[in-house]
Structures are given as structure tokens and as C-alpha cells.
Amino acid sequence: MIGTIAVLHGREPTSAEIREIEAWKKPTGILWIRSYQGRERIPDVRLISGSSGEICHHELGMVFWLDPAQVMFSSGNREEKQRMMRLVRPGERVADMFAGIGYFSIPAGMAGATVHAMEIHPVAYRYLLRNIDENRLENRIFAGLGDCRELLFGTYDRIIMGHFDSSLMLDAAFEHIRNGGTIHMHTAGRNPPFIPEEYRDACRDAGTVRRIKKVAPHTWHYVLDMRAG
């Protein structure tokens, strides 16, 4: 559930499964999201029953406004949000290169970091601004609309790359990470990722991999942590 809407991924639900969800969760609507398209991660979505629209989702003491038919949100990333809140230290300068509606920017800001949140999708960016305001983080999170490669500036203690195509933009991340800083690169595949050969000399170790969730048959969402230096 995201707010009052049941959001389903993967194969199309059966009529029996839909009835079970309606009886158990009593959602205002059921959305089936086939996939997310392009860099803007626009949902390929079908409304199965009820209605959809803007909702308020509460998670880990944070507030997220969104329309799940227009922007991406994954409740399966809850543990990764918690991990960011544990890892981030007050005073850190954090870049969130694919901020979306604030999935990781809000937790980092709550942990006391100064966050530079970047998003290319105008609708997601609008919700990002709203969620910064709703969580009273205007003095910690500073948002920018556009291509993250053009918005990065200075150096950061931590860079979050929460997009499955983030490996294509590692050049930009390594240009802006401080010596000893950490890059969290999200990716999807059958097997755990590894640090690309061209970046191994820029890393202190072989990296740490976390498996987050299954996103398709034989395909998993992973996060690779890399320490620069």
C-alpha cells in the first residue's frame, strides 16, 4: 500500500487476487505498474479498480506526497531508507543525483545532512519540493531541476545514485566525491554488481553489495557502496 492505494508490480493480477486485496486492504484504488520508462522513470500503469490520484504516504516518521500513476515510489526500499538514516552523519554534504520525490533525500536530511537533491522529471520535482516543505527540511535540502550531471558542483561526502542506469554516470560522481567519500550506486541484474574496472583505481576497496528486492524474474535490485580514495 502507498497511502490508500494498492500498487502492484510484476505480472498482471488475477480476478481472485484483486478481490482478496479489496477485501483485505480496502484500498481506494488498485494500480498495476508494468514498468518505469526512461530516465524520468514514468510509470507504465493501468488502473485495475477504484480511483487513483494524489496521496499522502507516511513512512518511518516521514511524509511523502505523490501520485503513484505519475511518479515512481517503491515501498520495497524501506530498509535502504533506514540504512541511509543510520549511515549519514550530521553535517555531511550529500548529493542525491536521482532524487525523485525525495525517497533518499528526505532520510538524509532527517539525519542531519545538507542535501543537494537533483531530479529531471518535472512532476517528481514538484513533489520533491512539496515533501521537503512537509518534512520541514527547507534549511537542509536544496533541490534542482535538470540533468544531474549539469547540476553537481563542488565536492560531496556522500553521493546517492538511486537509478538503475546510474553506472552510466559514474564519471560525474567520481568527479565530485571527496577522497574517502562514499558513492551508493543502485543497479538491477541477475548477479551482484562489481566496481567497473575503469574505476577500481579510484576506490579504496572492492565495495560492499546489498541485495534490496526482486524487481523481475531472475532480476534483483542491488546497491553497491564504493569508497573513493
Where are these regions (language model features)?
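Conserved beta-strand positions in the Rossmann-like core of class I SAM-dependent methyltransferases
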Residues: 95, 116-118
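Conserved SAM-binding loop of SAM-dependent methyltransferases across substrates and taxa
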Residues: 101-113
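A short glycine-rich, Lys/Arg-flanked "PGG" loop and its adjoining helix->strand segment in the class I
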Residues: 170-179
